[in-house]
Amino acid sequence: MSTDLQHIRIGLTNNHPCSYLPERQERVAVALDAELHTEQNYQLLMANGFRRSGDTIYKPHCERCHACQPIRISIPDFVLSRSQKRLLSKAKSLRWEMKTEMDAEWFELYSRYICKRHKNGTMYPPKRDEFSRFAQTTWLTTLFLHIYDESNQLLGVAVTDVMAQCSSAFYTFFEPDYPLSLGTLAVLYQVNYCQQNNEQWLYLGYQIDECPAMNYKTRFQRHQRLVNQRWQG
């Protein structure tokens, strides 16, 4: 870990059922020091595998499992794949816009997404206040990437933490029955935002190879994974 973070206080949660891999137990390490709640410190913490949920900064610390690997895209080295080029071509009629607040109709879209895609997950049933506590924080700049169609219909929202050297794709929800891959498209738009702002990295959270729903993250080149506290890729 970075020498600036050698002496932070860490608390461990109890083991509980894993949200992603059935029949496995999950445990997380939580950074306890409130002074870590700054943009500069959070950039260092993300580079060392941490992530946030609301104001809580954590990283997986499971006893018998190391499936969660932090993953990030190197923005200067990013290269579109053929399938991503095709997706952008099909999405020419769509547009994206970064905003400081979500549009008024966000919760209806979020509810459709959760009820269709994650009915067995921890965020079901969808609750407005619960999502707001999960997504927002008081010590980071959090922006909301909105995706619209040609009739200005809201198709997706990508919650994005924005910092000086990097951004973090925090959470994305979208129209579940739309015929294009809106989740992938949201990441491509976030990459575009990072390029426009001369950022180095876009963090995508954790990659779990055994979880098929996450494997889209590995299709972004050039990505890196944090393995044994070293970024590789």
Curated annotation (Swiss-Prot):
Enzyme Commission (EC) number: 2.3.2.29
Disulfide bond entries: none
Enzyme class at the top of the EC tree: transferase
Keyword DNA damage: no
Keyword Cytoplasm: yes
GO cellular component terms listed in the entry, alphabetical order: cytoplasm
Transmembrane segment boundaries: none
Pfam families: ATE_C (PF04377), ATE_N (PF04376)
Known catalytic reactions: N-terminal L-glutamyl-[protein] + L-leucyl-tRNA(Leu) = N-terminal L-leucyl-L-glutamyl-[protein] + tRNA(Leu) + H(+); N-terminal L-aspartyl-[protein] + L-leucyl-tRNA(Leu) = N-terminal L-leucyl-L-aspartyl-[protein] + tRNA(Leu) + H(+)
Any coiled-coil regions, as ranges: none
Location in or out of the cell: Cytoplasm
GO biological process: ubiquitin-dependent protein catabolic process via the N-end rule pathway
InterPro entries noted in UniProt: Acyl_CoA_acyltransferase (IPR016181), Asp_Glu_LeuTrfase (IPR017138), N-end_Aminoacyl_Trfase (IPR030700), N-end_Aminoacyl_Trfase_C (IPR007472), N-end_Aminoacyl_Trfase_N (IPR007471)
Any one GO molecular-function label of the UniProt entry: arginyl-tRNA--protein transferase activity
Keywords recorded for this protein, A-Z: Acyltransferase, Cytoplasm, Transferase
Family (UniProt): Belongs to the R-transferase family. Bpt subfamily.
Function per UniProt: Functions in the N-end rule pathway of protein degradation where it conjugates Leu from its aminoacyl-tRNA to the N-termini of proteins containing an N-terminal aspartate or glutamate.
Protein name: Aspartate/glutamate leucyltransferase
Classification lineage: Bacteria, Pseudomonadati, Pseudomonadota, Gammaproteobacteria, Vibrionales
